[in-house]
């Protein structure tokens, strides 16, 4: 399959999250990231806009009873920029994680315009 989106990491946050996971979880994350890179219309089950934010999305990963989220945004339409990730343990996404992602997104675009 031909890639229609490029996936990049901003700073080290995603890599630290990824490296801390089991091989099984890493495999599932890789599957979902591959899907996002090759499918034109990604199902909401895997990628959804974060309500109350401007341009912030969450990548959704489920493995058994474990739920993981990775925050990201789009840049120039075809580039997906990954920020922080975490294991979701409650129904509601922790505000601190959203704020961290918003801060990283702002830093990314500010740095890009320099």
Model-derived features with residue positions:
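Basic, Lys/Arg-enriched alpha-helical interface segments
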Residues: 1-67, 76-80, 88-114
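ATP-dependent carboxylate-activation loops
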Residues: 83
């Amino acid at each position: 399959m031909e890639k229609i989106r490029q996936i990049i990491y901003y700073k080290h946050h995603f890599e630290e999250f990824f490296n801390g996971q089991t091989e099984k979880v890493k495999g599932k994350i890789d599957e979902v990231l591959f899907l996002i890179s090759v499918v034109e219309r990604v199902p909401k089950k895997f990628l959804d806009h974060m309500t109350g934010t401007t341009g912030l999305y969450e990548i959704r990963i489920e493995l058994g009873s474990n739920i993981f989220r990775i925050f990201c945004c789009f840049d120039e339409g075809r580039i997906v920029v990954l920020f922080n990730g975490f294991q979701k343990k409650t129904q509601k996404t922790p505000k601190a994680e959203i704020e961290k992602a918003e801060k990283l997104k702002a830093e990314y675009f500010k740095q890009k315009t320099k």
